[in-house]
């Protein structure tokens, strides 16, 4: 077991997080905890990029993974559910003497886990919801921004953004009940000692390479049956409005299947939306640096073997209390 009890690997979509996470886990006798808000759902495989075959190693053994395929499509499974499951999986991995690796691109989930938050489920405010229900998604996000701070839930849909406003409004009125403010005060008093700071690796890509990978991956997923996956979800009874709320692939393909978008329009809009999503992901991760976290950036244009070597070097250096890689890795 390494001294750091949790290694975190983040990065934008299409950056190769899964393959690198598996390589690191194989080297450290580790297990992967997925930090992806959509991979929790069964039968949403292609669109969420589960890539489960990558968890199988060349020798036929497999890297155990957690928080993938644990809920049914259409079921409400939000940050509160995920955090509870994360804690259970994390403790179970430690109890068995293994190394947990938190791997994913949902920044809110990652940061909530790293903060160790004990989230208080702010009560529903039906009057506020009624006032917000008819506003556009952009208007809702503008309202949320006025509260400042980090959203307490994913804001990828109207429903989730309304919930985020509901939570922000509650804690603005009752700041003494805000668990995040209590935690921030604790962090400030603890300082920034190495033993208290999480070990975070972040894959980054040049914009042109990120755009290229997103385009190639979307084409590949369409060839693998992405549209058919959404058709099967609808046929099984998953409400179309719920699929639209899941965003990106599920939103645009559902709109295409409903006749609202042609195939060409769907692909064009989806690719743009994925690019914008990847940009937002990196904005979140860079923002973590401003919020007191130290991220070690990895050049995602390198091979998985090279990235794994650098990651393991950095992990060993952190374990010895150092922060800089040797020149051989420059």
Residue locations for each model-derived region?
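Phosphate/pyrophosphate-binding catalytic cores of soluble transferases and nucleic-acid-acting enzymes
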Residues: 1-330
């Amino acid at each position: 077991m390494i001294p750091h009890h949790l290694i975190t690997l983040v990065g934008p979509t299409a950056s190769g997080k899964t393959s690198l996470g598996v390589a690191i886990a194989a080297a450290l006798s580790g297990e992967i905890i997925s930090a992806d808000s959509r991979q929790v759902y069964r039968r949403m495989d292609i669109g969420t990029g589960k890539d489960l075959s990558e968890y199988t190693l060349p020798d036929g053994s497999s890297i155990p993974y957690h928080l993938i395929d644990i809920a049914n499509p259409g079921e409400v499974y939000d940050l509160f559910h995920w955090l509870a499951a994360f804690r259970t999986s994390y403790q179970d991995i430690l109890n068995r003497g293994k190394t947990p690796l938190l791997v994913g691109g949902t920044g809110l989930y990652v940061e909530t886990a790293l903060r160790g938050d004990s989230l208080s489920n702010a009560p529903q405010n039906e009057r506020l919801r009624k006032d917000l229900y008819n506003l556009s998604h952009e208007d809702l996000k503008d309202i949320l921004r006025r509260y400042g701070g980090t959203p307490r839930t994913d804001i990828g849909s109207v429903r989730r953004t309304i919930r985020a406003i509901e939570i922000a409004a509650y804690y603005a009125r009752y700041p003494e009940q805000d668990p995040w403010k209590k935690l921030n005060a604790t962090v400030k008093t603890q300082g920034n000692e190495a033993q208290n700071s999480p070990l975070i690796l972040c894959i980054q890509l040049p914009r042109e390479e990120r755009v290229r990978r997103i385009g190639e991956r979307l084409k590949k997923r369409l060839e693998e049956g992405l549209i058919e996956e959404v058709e099967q979800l609808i046929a099984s009874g998953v409400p179309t409005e719920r699929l639209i709320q899941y965003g990106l692939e599920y939103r645009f393909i559902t709109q295409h299947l409903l006749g609202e978008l042609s195939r060409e329009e769907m692909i064009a809009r989806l690719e743009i939306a994925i690019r914008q999503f990847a940009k937002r992901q990196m904005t979140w991760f860079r923002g973590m640096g401003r919020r007191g976290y130290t991220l070690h950036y990895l050049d995602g244009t390198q091979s998985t073997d090279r990235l794994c070597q650098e990651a393991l070097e950095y992990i060993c250096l952190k374990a010895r209390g150092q922060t800089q890689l040797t020149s051989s890795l420059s």
